[in-house]
Curated annotation (Swiss-Prot):
HAMAP family: UPF0761 (MF_00672). This is UPF0761 membrane protein VC_2742. InterPro entries: UPF0761_bac (IPR023679), Virul_fac_BrkB (IPR017039). Belongs to the UPF0761 family. The chain crosses the membrane at residues 43-63, 100-120, 135-155, 181-201, 213-233, 245-265. Its main location: membrane. One of its GO terms (cellular component) is plasma membrane.
Amino acid sequence: MKLTHSFIKQQARLGLNFFRYLLARMNHDRVNVNAGYLAYITLLSMVPMLTVLLSILSSFALFANAGEVIQDFVITHFVPAAGEVVKTALIEFVANTGKMTAVGGAFLFVAAIMLISNIDKNLNYIWRVQQKRRAVFSFSMYWMILTLGPILVGASIAATSYITSLKILDNEALSGVYNLFLRWLPFVLSYCAFVGLYLLVPNKKVHWQHAMLGALIAAILFELSKKGFAAYITQFPSYQLIYGALAAIPILFVWVYLCWLIVLVGAEVTAALGEREHWSDSQDMLHFAPLPKNEKE
């Protein structure tokens, strides 16, 4: 009994030390400031990124209608409230890019690359990565994300459409299972995306257990924030009263900021789990790993 009590007390102290270290680490890394910076970059790069992704999808006959399906799915499940307004605006913006020249198209591609590059830099900063990737390797990785990413998404959409068309779904039991699968699909996709982000982006080895736990926390926070944000927008429509038809702009900015805040918090959790030697309730708790060289200069 004494052993059990001692073990529980030890684990509670360890958890408290981790939580204190995590808060100090996030404050040190200015997570809230970096989330705002990434939100700003995302809003500037959103249309270029969508244009590049949809143009890649449209080049394959198999994925001819995948673009619209992806837009509907993302808006419905990942952008709470004001979804139709945001969708209409994005479709208009993307449609206007069809009138651009080759130089304009190149600019869109560069803007999309810049977004991925900034995500890469911020996450590597959280993991205190000292050695940067070579430029050729980084560009190859960004290119792979922009090309293979849409193809994989399009393939999954095509597979889902094929499964939906099967007659076996007329069975009531199978139909219930399929509906349950669709209900949990957004959470599963978010979780898998966070795991991949925390495992693959940092230029150092990340333990998969840490990445899975950090991704789980981020995915749960993301789902809770979706419901909470949607409830706030519908119950307290102050943005609509103040901004009127332009209400979608601040709503979208706040939502993108929340998304990046959650991504960075999950990254901080994942990185902190690998720094157990710093979990201490002493004054040395803030002994962080050294900053990247470019941050020292």
